[in-house]
Regions:
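Histidine-centered active-site/metal-ligand motif
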Residues: 29-33, 77, 88, 123-125
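Conserved, short, structured surface segments that act as functional micro-motifs
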Residues: 75, 99-175
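Conserved beta-strand positions that form and line the central face of beta-propeller blades
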Residues: 33, 74, 85, 109
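Short histidine-centered loop motifs in beta-beta connectors
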Residues: 80-104
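Solvent-exposed coil/turn segments that connect beta secondary-structure elements
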Residues: 37-39, 78-80, 129-133
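Short edge beta-strand segments in beta-sheet-rich domains
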Residues: 70, 84, 121-123
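Surface-exposed, glycine-biased beta-strand/turn segments
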Residues: 1-71, 103, 150-178
Length: 178
């Protein structure tokens, strides 16, 4: 059985970068970056660009916006303002606010980040948050999440069933380039 692999910079509230660009983030990480896993034989693997992105729980699309590596899909799970954000993806062209999704339904593919100056590997960024009830979806974007003061962020790892997660010290670029 394989396992997810996380480096400290991939985790919620980390101030560190985990990609070759290195250094510190300007703000604490708002979620979890997912891209590395073991193949069950002990080999380390990473997502290929274009891998399908399924949703973790049923919900309704309330917003789709650009982010710095692709696009982000905001999914409301209940009418209490609990939202998951799937970022750095290429969403299906049919996704629009109001679109209802079932658990496991594919919403898009991980964006190809090759050629970016920061050399960041293709990955899925997952944010879990609560927003004020009744907030219009068109107000949701990364500027709102990071600067409005109206968002409560949650650690995605505490909300996921993840018995096969492994935390590794250091950064990915340290393991690839000793």
């Amino acid at each position: 059985m394989g396992a997810w692999i996380f480096y400290p910079g991939m985790l919620f509230r980390s101030r560190d970068k985990w990609w070759p660009d290195a250094g510190s983030r300007p703000t604490a990480h708002e979620g979890l970056d997912i891209c590395y896993f073991t193949d069950g034989l002990g080999g380390k693997r990473q997502f290929d660009p274009g891998i399908n992105v399924p949703v973790m729980a049923a919900g309704t699309v309330i917003a789709v916006c650009d982010d710095f590596l692709g696009r982000s899909v905001f999914l409301e799970h209940l009418s209490d303002g609990m939202i998951s954000v799937y970022a750095h993806i290429i969403p299906l062209k049919t996704l629009r606010p109001g679109y209802k999704l079932s658990e496991g339904q594919v919403i898009g593919k991980v964006a190809d980040t090759a050629g970016r100056k920061n050399r960041m590997p293709a990955h899925l960024h997952l944010t879990i948050m609560r927003i004020p009830v009744g907030l219009p979806g068109e107000q949701l974007n990364w500027n709102f999440i990071c600067r409005s003061g109206r968002v409560t962020l949650f650690d995605p790892l505490t909300m996921m069933v993840c018995p096969s997660c492994r935390m590794l010290p250091g950064t990915d670029h340290e393991s690839q380039h000793p």
